[in-house]
């Protein structure tokens, strides 16, 4: 039997050298979805949901990074507990970032990823580069949470109306509940209660008792 001739021009050479500096066209443009995913969700539905999820993703990534800034820069008598709390909340927000981004990809969309794109998209106010007082840090974080929470219920309702139960579950069970709990922990630090000595009651209050 004659040996098969190998055309050296078409034979792919194996090399241990890395192929560096490669570029190519995008596989998929941002704002689009894959056409033929067997998810039982129409393409217009997935486009609408992924667009809203990307807004939620941008704001969640911004809040996550704001927590890390506060974790590093916090100062004052409550440094220790807030330093730890901010880092705990950062970790929880980071998990939400991953869940939201993967939901976008699962639906056939393209998730935001780069800091510059997130900065252009987020609705959360950009803080200064320097350090701020604890009360201002807490207020900024709560304001950012509020922006996210205001998105969650309408997004969850709309997802349910469109038959996207997976997104509805993610937004309510993970995003909303995590943000609500974190707001509670932050807000209690802004209650003006003495640490060491109770305030004296007014004369009127003392007489009434």
Q: Where do the model's predicted regions map?
A:
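Disorder-to-helix initiation segments
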Residues: 34-56, 134
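Conserved alpha-helical segments that form or flank metal/cofactor-binding pockets of metalloenzymes
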Residues: 68, 74-117
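Preference for long, well-ordered alpha-helical segments
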Residues: 148-209
